[in-house]
Regions:
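Soluble catalytic domains of enzymes that build or remodel membrane lipids, polysaccharides, and related
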Residues: 44, 48, 54-68, 76-274
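Transmembrane alpha-helices and immediately adjacent membrane-cytoplasm interface residues
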Residues: 2-40
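Short acidic/polar active-site loop segments enriched in Thr and Asp
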Residues: 73
C-alpha cells in the first residue's frame, strides 16, 4: 500500500478499509478455488486437448467423444500408430483438420488436429522426439504457437530426456504466446521440468486453475502428473483431467483466454475499492 494510505485522515482510513476488504475478498476467493474465471467481453478462447494413446491399447473413439464434448479447438496426441491415425481421421472427419502427423509402430508417433485456422504447421525434432508445432489462430485473430510434447522417459537415458526438455524450452521462447501440451515424462520435482518452465518462461495451467492433484499416470491409480499443459501469454480459465480410455495415461484439457495475464486480483480489487 502507498505510504499516504497509512497517514491519519479520512481519505487514509477509506483506503485502508478498501484494501482490507479487497484482500479479504481475494483470500476467500482463492481458498474457494477462484483461480481462473471467465473471459471478458471481446476476449476469444482457445481450448487444447492432449492425450497419450499408449500404442495398441486405447479406445480412440472414447478420446474423440471426450474432445468433442469439451469443444476443443486443438488436439495433440502421443503414441499414434498407423491404426490410431486412421481412426482419428475417420472420427474427426468434417469437424477437424489433420494439421500434422507421424504415425509409428513405437511410442514416438504423434499427431495434431484442429478446427481453427492453422499456419506454419510442421513436426520438429526435440532432440529426437517428434514434436508437432503450429501457429493456431484464435477467434479474435490472436496467434498462439501450440507444441505437442512426448519426451522419452528417463529410464531410456537421462541425457536424451534432459536434452528434449532443453530443446522444448528453446522452442517455446520462439513465440510470444505459446501452449506446450503433452506427456513430459517428468513431474514438477524433476530438474528438466523445472528448467523447461524457467527457461521457456512458462506457467503450468494446473497450478493456476486445476482442481485436485491433477495426477495422470498410471491411469488406474495415478501417482504422478506427467501429462500437463504449459503456457505463456494467455490467461488460463480451466484445466481438467479426463478418462483414460484404455491408455496408461489420463488426458488433459486446458481452456485459455487470449487476453493474457491480467493485473493481480489483489491490486485490481484494491484499485476498485479505493
Amino acid at each position: 500500500l502507498p505510504a499516504a494510505a497509512l497517514a491519519p485522515g479520512r481519505r487514509a482510513r477509506q483506503l485502508n478499509a478498501a484494501a482490507a476488504l479487497a484482500l479479504l475478498g481475494t483470500g476467500v476467493g482463492l481458498l474457494a478455488g477462484d483461480w481462473g474465471g471467465g473471459p471478458r467481453p471481446g476476449d476469444a478462447t482457445l481450448t487444447v486437448y492432449s492425450a497419450n494413446l499408449e500404442f495398441e491399447r486405447s479406445d480412440v473413439s472414447a478420446n474423440i467423444e471426450e474432445m468433442l464434448a469439451a469443444g476443443c479447438d486443438v488436439a495433440v496426441f502421443q503414441e499414434v500408430t498407423p491404426d490410431y491415425l486412421r481412426q482419428l481421421r475417420a472420427g474427426l472427419e468434417g469437424c477437424y483438420t489433420e494439421v500434422v502427423s507421424t504415425s509409428r509402430d513405437d511410442a514416438l508417433g504423434a499427431a495434431m488436429f484442429a478446427r481453427v485456422e492453422v499456419r506454419n504447421a510442421t513436426i520438429e525434432s526435440a532432440a529426437g522426439s517428434p514434436t508437432p508445432s503450429a501457429d493456431v489462430v484464435a477467434g479474435d485473430g490472436t496467434v498462439v504457437r501450440v507444441l505437442g510434447v512426448h519426451t522419452t522417459p528417463p529410464i531410456h537415458g537421462v541425457g536424451p530426456w534432459t536434452a528434449q526438455h532443453d530443446r522444448l524450452a528453446a522452442m517455446a521462447r520462439e513465440a510470444d504466446r505459446v501452449v506446450v501440451a503433452g506427456d513430459f515424462n517428468a513431474s514438477g520435482r524433476h530438474q528438466p521440468m523445472r528448467q523447461l518452465v524457467a527457461g521457456g518462461h512458462l506457467r503450468d495451467a494446473h497450478r493456476e486453475v486445476g482442481q485436485g492433484l491433477g495426477l495422470t499416470w498410471p491411469a488406474r491409480l495415478p501417482i504422478a502428473r506427467l501429462d500437463r499443459v504449459l503456457f505463456r501469454g494467455l490467461e488460463p480459465l480451466s484445466l481438467s483431467v479426463g478418462c483414460a480410455a484404455g491408455s496408461d495415461h489420463r488426458p488433459v484439457t486446458a481452456r485459455f483466454s487470449t487476453a493474457g495475464r491480467r493485473v493481480s486480483a489483489v491490486v485490481e480489487k484494491v484499485r476498485e475499492r479505493a
